[in-house]
Amino acid sequence: MKLVTYTRLHSDNVARLGIWSGDVVLDTYRAAEILGIDTKRRSLFGSMEHLLGDWYETWPELQAMAAACPEEARVPAAKVCFRSPVRRPPTVRDFYSFETHVRNARARRNLTVPPEWYEAPAFYFSNPGALIGHQAAVTRPPGTKALDY
């Protein structure tokens, strides 16, 4: 199950929570409405933040929604713009944990992967305001000649 935050293209630009499967995104709030989930609980399916805040309670309902996948709550994936899954995370930690990436980056400087790298995960705090959604255009900062992968 792929949970996404999205907006509808050429629409009101309101961020919505969805379940993405193939070429369809299921609008979870609309699905909750169709499936008769009461108004108070329905709000939990309106955003990723609300859903994650009550994860253990909402997970069974989310699975039921995905299984039912009401037609009226389906949105073609081609008609959505994916956003950052969590719109305003309080913090982001980026782990320097992919060996191939570390090896390639260090090889450019004629360095090997140090033994310490295998002993403890390295991470750094990243900018939570710089997150973007799937397939969103990455803006290259002025003066930048190349981007990392």
List each model region and its residues.
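Active-site microenvironments in enzyme catalytic cores
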Residues: 1-11, 20, 29-149
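Extracellular disulfide-bonded cysteine-rich modules/repeats
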Residues: 15-17
